[in-house]
Amino acid sequence: MPLFIVETSCSLISWLFLYLLLCHLNSGRDSEWNCRLVTLFHGILIICLTAYIGFIAGPWPFTHPGTENTYFQILTLVLSLGYFLFDMAWCVYFRTEGPVMLAHHTMSIFGILLALGLGESGIETCAVLFGSEITNPLLQARWFLKRMGCYDSLAGDVVDLLFILLFASVRIGVGSRMLYCELTSPKPSLIVKVGGVAIYTLSWIFMVDIARFACRKTCGKYRRWKEQYKLDGVNGHAVKIK
């Protein structure tokens, strides 16, 4: 336990140091800009680490849930735990996120603590982290495009489309398969299975919000296209009369 506290504290301090360093280097930017950079770095790092764990180091999470944690899994989980503690504290202090996102962070923290405390189910926890973070770079890119005034462009449309497709296919599609394997396997403990159901339910809450956003954006673009089409028709008719 003392070693775990030291490791988690080192992880938390490392993320805090990175944030403070970015604040120093980007003094012209606000705190959220620098926090988003930390979030982006964490997302890319965890995607790479969990992809290596799942696809190369093994074991395969769909066939071996509930197995004993490996050193590399523990390292990845501790790194991510430190980040979520940092980001949770930052979000609460600056009041930038709503209850759903705070619930996601809380579940992530407890899920990682559970896997580390039990000494097992690290592989499926890493798989969940991979699914959660795979859309993170796109989410941050969307925010940065908005801040730079470039969101209402082809780049913004591409980022949104890729985000929706990735979220639906990985977090909902692959996530459904992962949850099924978790629930049907006799190895994972009951509390881990309950946690898996909770995370999956939260993913569906996000999915409903994303679907509503997609409908609003599509309808808005269609209305603007129709208005532009009518305007072009009127202008063309006026030219013919002249």
UniProtKB/Swiss-Prot annotation:
Regions that span the bilayer: 3-23, 37-57, 74-94, 109-129, 154-174, 190-210
Compartment(s): Membrane
Keyword Transmembrane helix assigned: yes
SMART domains: TLC (SM00724)
Keyword tags: Membrane, Transmembrane, Transmembrane helix
InterPro entries assigned to the protein according to its UniProt record, in alphabetical order: TLC-dom, TLCD5
Pfam families referenced in this protein's UniProt entry, alphabetically: TRAM_LAG1_CLN8
Membrane topology qualifier: Multi-pass membrane protein
Family statement drawn from the similarity comment of this UniProt entry: Belongs to the TLCD5 family.
Name of the protein in question: TLC domain-containing protein 5
Natural source organism: Danio rerio
Lineage summary: Eukaryota, Metazoa, Chordata, Craniata, Vertebrata
